[in-house]
Amino acid sequence: MAKGTPSFGKRNKTKTHVRCRRCGRRAYHVRKGYCAACGFGRSRRIRRYSWQNKKVNRKRRR
């Protein structure tokens, strides 16, 4: 099995991020089990910093 560039082509088979239940963004990491945008699954508090300009979008699409 080769390592390096040929192996990177096999990384696109599974979805890394799916839609988050709390913030609605496609930032919930399936294998890690938490959202990169709002921190759902890692903490009860919404991930928020003073240097960021994000709004929490709780509307669900169906």
UniProtKB/Swiss-Prot annotation:
Disulfide bonds: none annotated. GO terms for molecular function: rRNA binding; structural constituent of ribosome; zinc ion binding. Its cofactor is Zn(2+). PROSITE patterns: RIBOSOMAL_L37E (PS01077). Zn(2+) binds at C20, C23, C35, C38. One of its GO terms (biological process) is translation. Keywords: Metal-binding, Ribonucleoprotein, Ribosomal protein, RNA-binding, rRNA-binding, Zinc, Zinc-finger. GO terms for cellular component: cytosolic large ribosomal subunit. Pfam families: Ribosomal_L37e. Binds to the 23S rRNA. This is Large ribosomal subunit protein eL37. The gene is rpl37e.
